C-alpha cells in the first residue's frame, strides 16, 4: 500500500469518526447507525462497516478521536505559551482547558457528543474503560504539572471534577455558572497552595 493510499484511508476513517460525533452530538447516541454515519460522511455503508464492525467499535473510536483532538489542541496551545514565554502559569493552564471546553460548546455538537458518550459508557464496558484510561492520563498529567509548579497540596482529581461541572454547565447553556467554575478552580488552587 502506497503512502498516498494510507493517507486516503486515514482521511476516510477520520471523516467517518467526525460524522459519528456530529450524529451523536446532534441527534443522540441511539441515532448512531452504520447507515446514518455513511450518509453523513458521504461514503458507502460498506466503508463504515469495514472500519468499524459494530456500533460499539464506532462509539469507542469516536470517543478516542474526541479525546485525541482535545489533547492535540491543548498541547498546541500550551506549547505556544512555552515558546512565547518559556513557561506558563497555572492560570494560563486553566484558561487553556476552559477555552477548549468553550470551543467544544460553540461547535454546536462536540460537547453534547462527549456528554452523550459519558452517559452511554455506563452501558458499554469498552467505552467505560477508554474513559477511565483518559481520566487517569488527565489526572496524572495535571498532577505532575501542579507538583512541578509548586502546588503539591492540590489534588488534580478535584480540579478535574470542577471542570466536569464546568462542562455540564456548558452542556445546559448555563454560561454564568461555567464562568464561576473557572474562578472556583483558580481560588481553590491558590488556597491549597499555602
What residue spans do the PLM features occupy?
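Hydrophobic/aromatic-rich alpha-helical bundle segments in the mid-to-C-terminal region
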Residues: 5, 127-132, 147-194
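Short, basic, alpha-helical segments at the C-terminal edge of helix-turn-helix-like DNA-binding modules
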Residues: 64-71
Amino acid at each position: 500500500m502506497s503512502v498516498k493510499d494510507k493517507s486516503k484511508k486515514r482521511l476516510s476513517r477520520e471523516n467517518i469518526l467526525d460524522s459519528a460525533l456530529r450524529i451523536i452530538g446532534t441527534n443522540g447516541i441511539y441515532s448512531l447507525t452504520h447507515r446514518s454515519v455513511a450518509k453523513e460522511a458521504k461514503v458507502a455503508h460498506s466503508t463504515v462497516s469495514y472500519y468499524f464492525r459494530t456500533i460499539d467499535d464506532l462509539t469507542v473510536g469516536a470517543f478516542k478521536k474526541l479525546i485525541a483532538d482535545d489533547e492535540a489542541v491543548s498541547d498546541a496551545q500550551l506549547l505556544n505559551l512555552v515558546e512565547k514565554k518559556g513557561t506558563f502559569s497555572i492560570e494560563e493552564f486553566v484558561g487553556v482547558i476552559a477555552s477548549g471546553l468553550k470551543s467544544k460548546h460553540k461547535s454546536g455538537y462536540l460537547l453534547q457528543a462527549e456528554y452523550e458518550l459519558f452517559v452511554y459508557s455506563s452501558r458499554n464496558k469498552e467505552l467505560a474503560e477508554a474513559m477511565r484510561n483518559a481520566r487517569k492520563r488527565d489526572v496524572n498529567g495535571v498532577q505532575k504539572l501542579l507538583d512541578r509548579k509548586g502546588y503539591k497540596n492540590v489534588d488534580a482529581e478535584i480540579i478535574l471534577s470542577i471542570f466536569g461541572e464546568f462542562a455540564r454547565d456548558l452542556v445546559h447553556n448555563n454560561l454564568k455558572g461555567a464562568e464561576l467554575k473557572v474562578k472556583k478552580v483558580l481560588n481553590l488552587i491558590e488556597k491549597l497552595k499555602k
